[in-house]
Amino acid sequence: MRVLFYVSILVIIASVHTQLISVHVIFRHGARAPVLNVTSEEAKSYFYRGLGQLTDEGFEQARLMGKVLRDRYVNSFVDARMLSSQLLFRSSPVERCLMTLQTVGNTMFPNATPPVQTVAKPDDFLLVPKLDCDFQLGEWDNYFNLTESDKKMARKNPWFVSDKALRKAVTKTDFLQDRGGENLPALILEKEAGLAVPSWFNEGAYKESLHVFYSALAVMSSVGEYKSSKGIRIKSGLLMEKVFNDIQEKVRCHEKKEVSNIKCDIHKLQVFSSHDLLILPILETLGIREEVLGKDMPPEFMSTIIIETMIVDNSPVVKVLFRKNPREITLRDVTGFVKNCPPGQPLCPVQRFTSCCNEFITSDPKSECYAETTVEKQSEWVMTPLSWIIVAIAILLLIALILMTYFVIRYKNRSIVNIKKLSLEN
């Protein structure tokens, strides 16, 4: 009887037809050097590629990510020969992101590395979070009561505000009370790399510094206590709209495929390499930030969000996976925690998933970010050389018209006078 029960279970499982139709992978770059400065000669030697550059550990993390993706998708989902039509590899133009994605791609397809696409930083609203939007200064002013001098500094360098958030967070700590002026982001990376750090930067100070560093990121990414729907839209809204549209398009394609036998393989695996300032608002958008990162914690290097779309018994559904630690090879299923999805369930209907977060998506972040500037530019009158020529011609024509009118009136008046004289003489 028990054998019959297990056999029936296996029959039911086997009868469920599942087809993976699209995958979106979004990750933070691998381990890097501090961006602004290091705190010792030892650190300077260790981070030999320079500030902000990928480290040897970062390359290893990228290779492991490539292995995870290769084992999960290459052969079983995409062609192992690397057909570029099936893939979209897109990176932020920042070198550490480009190198991370290139390494991931090379590990997935060792015989033919996928082409990596990118866009210049000022024009990239997909993977480069914008920090210079007009409205953000107003939001920051509400948080920190900025002086006019502060506002000038923030316009010149938005990270000035991040430092304010960091110093504010330091005042709430136990170990870091008098350390607001220290280079905490660099010390975090140096300690994680196993380098010597000051004695005061013990384990307690290190753990507190992670929360402090999160606060510095939160204000720039518009999440947590600094949550702003508009701020999130500007940073991750275009990418999330693309993901939702891609999913819906793939579902429509496969519905048509049933009757017309069309191909639906174009860009069915998309991989994006970006920054912590993009990962945070995406997690906030999906409603899973605290669940996957912990309370007030920053994303680790190579933090990865994977969205799989599949057809299960003719129903389009989504599975959301997360990889927190750069050394992990397992993926955590977090579908049941995603906003608008059935709680605790391993699959989420596509319709519910793609309608989860309308307040956080946008098709035109540029106009939302620079709305006032755009209006001002449109209303400005710019005098080009051609404009001056046209104005000069118009003035000459006006003068000529006035003179012609004057002479016509004068001639007409003379004619009337002559007629009157003739009438009197006759």
From Swiss-Prot:
Disulphide connectivity of cysteines: C133-C369
Highest taxon of source: Eukaryota
Annotated InterPro entries: Acid_Pase_AS, His_Pase_clade-2, His_PPase_superfam, Histidine_acid_phosphatase
Family of this protein: Belongs to the histidine acid phosphatase family.
Signal peptide: 1-18
Coiled coil: none
Record: glycosylation sites: N37, N145
Matches recorded under PANTHER family: ACID PHOSPHATASE-RELATED (PTHR11567), PROSTATIC ACID PHOSPHATASE (PTHR11567:SF211)
Catalytic activity: a phosphate monoester + H2O = an alcohol + phosphate
Record's protein name: Putative acid phosphatase 1
Cellular component terms (Gene Ontology): membrane
Extracellular side: 19-388
Gene transcribed to yield this protein: acp-1
Membrane topology: Single-pass type I membrane protein
